[in-house]
Amino acid sequence: MNPYNLSYDELEKKAKAIRRKIVVLNANSPAGGHTGADLSQVEILTSLYFRVLNNDPKDLINPERDIYIQSKGHGAGGYYCCLAEAGYIPEDWLPTYQHSDSKLPGHPVKHKTPGVELNTGALGHGLPVAVGLAIAAKKSGSKRKIYVLTGDGELGEGSNWEAALTAAQYKLDNLIIINDKNKLQLAGFTKDILCTDPLDKKWEAFGMEVHECQGNDIRSVVDTLESIQPNGKPHVVIANTTKGAGISFIEGRPEWHHKVPKGDEVELALEELKDE
């Protein structure tokens, strides 16, 4: 079970605290960051780490722990902020993000950061590995679940769809794929670069059980994830999000894919994220 199991209100407060960490972390990075991608995933990560995952930071080698894979590796900054808030890594590591010899590199690296299960960043790799882990869990009789978060533009990588076919073939109902559908990627709007809509129909055609939620609404995310039951099919949650969610001048702005807040922007963002 989850060691925190927070209420909806408590999860909302955690999400806001993680967003504040994201602002400061990116502002202090010597090598830029991915502020928009970090922010769009916050409610998803918060729901998983503080309510849904059977994963304890004090027992990282438990063979029955649920596995979470951050396939959208460019969202590493937000991922680290969540790991710090949840007690997987020390808070004082966050100011070292992307510094030389840091344990928090620009994309997740398993042997450097406690809690990270897979090196990611080259898009389209996380889901295939998650499928392999789900197959292994089935074969060994494990009850663990495998969760993987994919980006929106990431679904343009064909390896995801090969993995989906395999997941359906092996009836991996212990696999939960979450799409952070924020409608943007590095070069602009996903629909203008390589449109994957209607995404629900595509996943269904590949043999998935499809769920949908408002990905920046804690209650919607939690209720959707907790409603998933084994039924012989892999599960996909299309989480409709806003890139840069939570900060008005970042939301839905393509330039914030690789931009970080500076100067007055930091103060403005933190002002918007104050506890009420």
Swiss-Prot record:
Residues annotated as transmembrane: none
Keyword Translocase: no
UniProt cross-references to SUPFAM superfamilies, sorted A to Z: Thiamin diphosphate-binding fold (THDP-binding) (SSF52518)
InterPro entries: THDP-binding, Transketolase_N
Protein keywords: Carbohydrate metabolism, Thiamine pyrophosphate, Transferase
Domain of life: Bacteria
This enzyme's EC code(s): 2.2.1.13
Cofactor(s) required, per the database record: thiamine diphosphate
Catalytic activity reported: apulose 4-phosphate + D-glyceraldehyde 3-phosphate = D-xylulose 5-phosphate + dihydroxyacetone phosphate
Pathway as given in its UniProt record: Carbohydrate metabolism
Class of enzymatic activity (EC top level): transferase
Gene Ontology MF annotations: transferase activity
Protein family (similarity comment): Belongs to the transketolase family.
Assembly mode: Probable heterodimer composed of AptA and AptB.
Biological function: Involved in catabolism of D-apiose. Catalyzes the transfer of the glycolaldehyde group from apulose-4-phosphate to D-glyceraldehyde 3-phosphate, generating dihydroxyacetone phosphate and D-xylulose-5-phosphate.
The protein, known as: Apulose-4-phosphate transketolase subunit A
Organism: Actinobacillus succinogenes (strain ATCC 55618 / DSM 22257 / CCUG 43843 / 130Z)
Gene transcribed to yield this protein: aptA
